[in-house]
Amino acid sequence: QRLVIQFLKWTEGGFNVLNMILKDLRISPLRNILTGISMFVGIIAMISSVLVGTLGKEYLISVNAQMYGWSPTYSFSITGSDFQDTIKMENFFLVIYNTDHFVAVTFSMLEEITVAPVASVSSLQDISDTVYKKTVPVDVVFTTSTYNKIYNLPMSSGDWFDSSEINKTLCLVVNKAAQNYFDTSYAVGNVESSLSLTPFNVVGTVNDGTDIPTVYLDAHSIELLVPNMWKVKNATVHWHSEAGITMRQMYSSLHDILEDTIGGNLDIIGKSDIGDTYNSVLSVLQLGLLVTSFLLLFVSVLGQINIGLSSLEQRTHELLIRRAIGASRANIVTLVLGAQLTISVFVCIVSILISFFLVQGMGLFLPVDSPVAALEYPILSAVVAVITSVVVALLGGLLPALKAAKLEPALALR
């Protein structure tokens, strides 16, 4: 019971102190507003400096991943393999799909593939003469369904290839640059050595970051269903691993896969790690913004000290009367520092709310096929900003508070 009574007394005393602090803030509202603005600018600058480093780096890496693959991506060339053996190719595809890492294969063909949009595939023989005149100038990429795991390929509409082994269908995906050519749900393709037309379903549009019209074909479906189009010259393996294995281990694993399936020669092309080249530039920019934010907060400290001392000159008589009627030195320090901390807490809440809604608002305005994923709020930087704001408030109010605590009650009689 005594503890409860003591707790209630402490609570009542805390509310009384808070009430005094709020009344104290009403004495000079303009001064407190200017102090809050200076703190607000410093906190926003600190959060912005972290955002530039994190979001800026994420944006650059995401854009580069559209062209060069997620970092790091290793490339290997395959030549001299038995690409025409259906059984061996099926085993090869099966092993590639079951790899624990992200592995995709692109194939270069001996013959050029031409593609044309059609309104319907029900009567190709009747429209074959006109179809050849509608062929569009596009790059054709034969690849596996895991290609969009290696490269950052957000979908503008539709879907990517189905990686299921069951019910393989002939489908293609076009990029945004080729979208104007393929305004229908169907397309046909053929090779130079044949007049037969092969129908495809246009299943999606992808943002691959290039201005060159490109069509992506499911290589596994072509190998299964269109043997006259499956005339492979060589292949390239793209390997992205997050497990930290070395290039030599990848080479050894791929070499074993080839030995067990289609055979051939394996050569290392190289490593795509272009995203890391931006680290130094972003680090310098982030450091500059951090220094700027700390300078702004330092100026805020000086401003608070100056305002606190000038306010102390105006409130000397009031504080002396408080001392004369029984206020302790600790009460005076609490009153002066409490005002600064109250402003700091309020500014922190406002700053974090504004910056949070700005970050979330930026994500809402991103297009569906944006290479950058949903933006994440930098919680760590917000915590650092709050701690820094409290420290700034304490430093800014400490000198005026200590000076106010040294006032002698006898001076109130003057």
Feature map (PLM): residue ranges:
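Hydrophobic secondary-structure segments that place a key small or acidic residue at a functional site
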Residues: 131-232
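Transmembrane alpha-helical interface segments in multi-pass membrane proteins
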Residues: 30-41, 46, 294-303, 309-311, ...
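Hydrophobic alpha-helical transmembrane segments of membrane transport and translocation systems
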Residues: 394-414
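Structural beta->alpha junctions
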Residues: 78-83, 133-134, 205-209, 238-245
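N-terminal Sec/SRP start-transfer signal
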Residues: 1-45, 414
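N-terminal membrane-entry
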Residues: 278-296, 380
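Membrane-proximal extracellular/periplasmic loop immediately following the first transmembrane helix
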Residues: 50-147, 253
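A cross-kingdom feature of multi-pass membrane systems that activates on extracytoplasmic/periplasmic
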Residues: 235-286
